[in-house]
């Protein structure tokens, strides 16, 4: 029997990436070391990483027909990512961003043109055949619609034997109040350092202890804290930690968080423990920071 896929729902964007010696001053003109087009967006990047790790995966997000979408679809296919679930929109433009990567420290600065393109709706998601998937990951965006999607997965799972249930993860990355309702869904919830700090927490441990009451019974809450590594808290109340695995030289941090999330999901989907998944996530994300783009992470 063919292995079931991991579906990632969220953003795809065209990243136009300029690699520079140092971050430019305002009202100045500099030359870049190199420039490239790269498919980006959280859910899209996570698909790239899952595919590189060897997991069959699919992407669901919005695109509008045109040159940008042609490039993105071709790149998904080159990576072996299934795009049959894409929600094609008749209005709006496919999003793009300008990314500046500082070659001296790997820091990335992103200017996103988040266009008028509608996000994937619950109606779009109704058309998805859930039996194809063993895991569905949702990047928090239009949360009121995504709650309906998550409720549909829950309803589907109630009718399935344990081994056929779909596992669900949710990412709460942006500090927007609307997204916080997503904490209550999913077997695994990824909360970002940005959200944790926005809510007044000063460390991953503090954030996990403070936010665990918001997740559903039995869920695992995960928080990565950049160079300090990542922590996780599950229903047993035991705090788990993995140190970071920094590369010899940090060259590109664009997509490091998406790499971490995908690697944790991959590891858990393979039956590994939360501690093993946390460590694997930090290892792969660390390796990615030492590379331009994603090639070479495995």
From Swiss-Prot:
Requires potassium. Inhibition by ADP. Most abundant in liver, kidney, gut, spleen and pancreas. Low levels also found in adrenal, muscle, brain and eye. Its EC number is 2.7.1.3. It comes from the Eukaryota. GO terms for cellular component: cytoplasm; cytosol; extracellular exosome. CDD domains: Ketohexokinase (cd01939). ATP binds at residues 108, 226-229, 255-258. One of its GO terms (molecular function) is ketohexokinase activity. Homodimer. It is linked to Fructosuria: Benign defect of intermediary metabolism. Catalyzes the phosphorylation of the ketose sugar fructose to fructose-1-phosphate. This is Ketohexokinase.
């Amino acid at each position: 029997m063919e292995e079931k896929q991991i579906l990632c729902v969220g953003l795809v964007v065209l990243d136009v990436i300029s690699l520079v010696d140092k971050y430019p001053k305002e009202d100045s003109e500099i030359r870049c070391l190199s420039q490239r087009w790269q498919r980006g967006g959280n859910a899209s990047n996570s698909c790239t990483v899952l595919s590189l790790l060897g997991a069959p995966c699919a992407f669901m997000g919005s695109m509008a027909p045109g040159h940008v979408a042609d490039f993105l679809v071709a790149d998904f296919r080159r990576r072996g990512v299934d795009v049959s679930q894409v929600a094609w929109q008749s209005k709006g433009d496919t999003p793009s961003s300008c990314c500046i990567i500082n070659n001296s420290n790997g820091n990335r600065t992103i200017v996103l043109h988040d266009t008028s393109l509608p996000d994937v709706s619950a109606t779009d998601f109704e058309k998805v055949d859930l039996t194809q998937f063993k895991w569905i990951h949702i990047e928090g965006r239009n949360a009121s619609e995504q709650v309906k999607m998550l409720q549909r997965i829950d309803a589907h799972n109630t009718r399935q034997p344990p081994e056929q249930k779909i596992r669900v993860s949710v990412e709460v990355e942006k500090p927007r109040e609307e997204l916080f309702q997503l904490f209550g869904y999913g077997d695994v919830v990824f909360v970002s350092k940005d959200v944790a700090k926005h809510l007044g927490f000063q460390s991953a441990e503090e954030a996990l202890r403070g936010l665990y009451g918001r997740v559903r019974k039995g869920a695992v809450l995960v928080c990565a804290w950049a160079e300090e590594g990542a922590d996780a808290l599950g229903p047993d109340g035991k705090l788990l930690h993995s140190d970071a695995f920094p590369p010899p030289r940090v060259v590109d941090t664009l997509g490091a968080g998406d790499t971490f999330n995908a690697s944790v999901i991959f590891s858990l989907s393979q039956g590994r423990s939360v501690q093993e998944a946390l460590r694997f996530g930090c290892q792969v994300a660390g390796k990615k920071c030492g590379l331009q783009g994603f090639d070479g992470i495995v």
